Every structure is written in structure tokens, then in C-alpha cells.
Amino acid sequence: MPRIQVLDIRGSKESVGSTPHLRAAILEGLLKPPGSRTLPSETLYDEVGLKMYNDGMKAWAEWYYPVEAERQILERYGRDIAKLFTTSAKGKAVLIELGAGSLDKTSQVLLSAAEITRTTGPMNNIAYYALDLERGELERTIGRLQEVIGDQIAGKISTAGMWGTYDDGIRVIEKNELELEPDIPVHILFLGGTIGNFSKQDGDVAFLKSLPLDHKRGDTLLVGMDRHKSADAIERSYGFAAAKDWIMNGLKVSGRVLTGDEGLFEIGNWERYAKYNEELGRYEAGYKSQKEHALKISEGVDITFLKDEVVLVMFSNKYTDAEMDSVVDSAGLVKNGSWMDEKAQYCLLSLRANNGPV
């Protein structure tokens, strides 16, 4: 097996995802008035949380429709999608996946790209980088990727990790820290419907605008968006058993980051909150206080939670077709192509800057 290369691209120890930054974000959310308190979703993705999430997705893929829908799209339309990964005059390109997770879905993307790529010698034409917050999980998942499809992509696609945040990845592209030749296009993968974790028609647009897509060299973005559907269907799909343990692990992470004590948030004082918010068109998850109780974080910092108060830790937007079009247009992007699963539950979009080549 090839050596697993992981680039440390973290901008600084104070960057997003670092303990000092995460502690500040946790405090900021908890010091809001009751009824509007939050915990950052990063608390769900420590090494333990990532493994719980990835294992849960595999075990409950039948119920958690985004996994099956995205897999179906990539298997059915993978070659069409890969054909939109433009290359340089020498046939080279870079793929960077933001928030790579388990890489299961990525395998099909890379297999499709390998099928259509041409080789000009012993060097790999396409370089794939998986970006994520946890180095250990990156090494584990890239190692697994190499075990499963390494022989099929050998000589065509190289694989490596990027240890850092979305912002770090964006900086690497903007400042060309990979030292790419000017005409080598960069194709960003943002799969899993993760764009729905930003505020709708606001944070999602701002994030897409922040992506440095260079139209002159043919950069693209492949993004997954979850389509609007009934509340019952959504709540049922998120109701798998592992989801509770995964969400509750966020309280342990928050306690550890705040004071070093994973038991700071007594689990008995909380239950998992999970509900589809019809008004905002999003699934919400977090914690519901079982009784009024106080939490002492440090000298002079005490927080009282009310009975039945909800603290949100994550949400996932579900988009109507009109909302998808609005987000894309507002971000200054245009579609190269779009694909849906057979039940029309989920959509993959290939996007480029609106002044890019047709």
C-alpha cells in the first residue's frame, strides 16, 4: 500500500477547529438568551464523533436516504460527472474534497475519473486531496480508500489528505500553496448535502461565494443539495439508532473543550432533540433540557438552562428547486449539469463561475 500522505495546512493553532477557537465558539453559543442557545457543529466531529457518524451512515444507509441517493447518482452518472472535470493541456487536474468524511462516496467519483483520464507517463494525471479536521480519521479513511480502489486508480490518480478547515483549504487554493502550474484546474467536491448546514439563502450563498473558482482554467464545484420532501420522510431518515449517540457525544466534546471534563454536561439532564422545522425548511438536532439546572463553567461564568429548553447543535436545509436556483444565482455561479436519484430526493450539481467557459 502506498504511504498515506497528509498535509498539515492549518493556518495557526488559533484557527477554526482548534481548541481555543472552539472553546470561544461554544461559550458564544451558550451565553445567548434561553431559546436561542447553540453549540457549534464542530463538537460533533472529533475523532470519536466522526467514526460514530461514518459507521452509522453505513449501517443505516437504507433509511438515511442521502447516502443511498448520492451513491445511486454517482454510480449511474459518474462518467458524465467526471467528464466535466476539465484538465490542463497536459491532462492534469486537482480534486479537493471539503469535509471528506468516510470517502465511501468519493470512491465512485475517483473510479469514474480514472476510467476516462488519459495517462502520459508514469506520473498520476489527477491529484485528489481529502480535507478534514481530524488527522487520525483522515489517515484511516484514506488508507481504506487505497485498499478498496487503489489498484483501479493506480497510475492515474494520486490520493492524499489535507488536515485543516474549510478556510484553510480555501487559502491553499487561493494562494496556490500546492504550487500548481497556472493552467491546472482545481475541482472542489462538496458532497453529502453539507451546504445545507449553513443558514439558508444567506450562509450557504456566502460560503459558495468564498470558493475561489478560477473560470480561466476551468475550475468547477460538485455540490450535493438535499431536496424538499415531507416532514415524516425526513424525520424517519434521521431516526437511526446511532444518531442519538453521535449527537450526545457532542456534549462530551463540549465539556472536554470547556473545562477538560467530559462529564460537565450531565447526560441525565438532557435528551436528544430532533425535529423538522417546517417554517425554516430544515431538519434540526440538538439537546433538550430535562429540568432546570445550572452549569458552572468557570469562576463567574454560570449558565442556567430552563426545563424543556432546546440547544441546537446542527441543522440541515432541504431545498425546493426554486431555492436551489436562487442559491446558485446569488452565489454568482451557473450549472454545468445536474443529476437526481430515481426518487428525486437528492441532487448533485456541477457549477462554475458565471463568467467561465461554456
Swiss-Prot record:
InterPro entries hit by this protein: EgtD_Methyltrsf_superfamily, MeTrfase_dom, MeTrfase_EgtD-like, SAM-dependent_MTases_sf
* Originating species: Psilocybe serbica
Keywords, alphabetical:
Methyltransferase, S-adenosyl-L-methionine, Transferase
Q: What is its EC number?
A: 2.1.1.-
- What does the sequence similarity comment in the record state about its family? Belongs to the methyltransferase superfamily.
User: Recorded GO terms, molecular function?
Assistant: methyltransferase activity
Flavoprotein found in the keyword field = no
Q: What domain of life is recorded for the organism?
A: Eukaryota
Which named protein is this?
L-tryptophan methyltransferase trpM
Q: Which reaction does it catalyse?
A: L-tryptophan + S-adenosyl-L-methionine = N(alpha)-methyl-L-tryptophan + S-adenosyl-L-homocysteine + H(+); N(alpha)-methyl-L-tryptophan + S-adenosyl-L-methionine = N(alpha),N(alpha)-dimethyl-L-tryptophan + S-adenosyl-L-homocysteine + H(+); N(alpha),N(alpha)-dimethyl-L-tryptophan + S-adenosyl-L-methionine = N(alpha),N(alpha),N(alpha)-trimethyl-L-tryptophan + S-adenosyl-L-homocysteine + H(+)
GO BP annotation list: methylation
Per the UniProt entry, the dependence of activity on temperature is: Optimum temperature is 25 degrees Celsius.
Q: Which gene encodes it?
A: trpM
Q: Which Pfam families match?
A: Methyltransf_33 (PF10017)
Role summary: Methyltransferase that catalyzes iterative L-tryptophan N-methylations to produce L-abrine (N-alpha-methyl-L-tryptophan) and N,N-alpha-dimethyl-L-tryptophan. Also catalyzes a third methylation to yield L-hypaphorine (N,N,N-alpha-trimethyl-L-tryptopan), an agonist of the phytohormone indole-3-acetic acid. Can also N-methylate the non-native amino acid substrate 4-hydroxytryptophan, but the ability to incorporate trpM into a functional psilocybin biosynthesis pathway is indeed thwarted by the inability of the L-tryptophan decarboxylase psiD to use N,N-dimethyl-4-hydroxytryptophan as substrate.
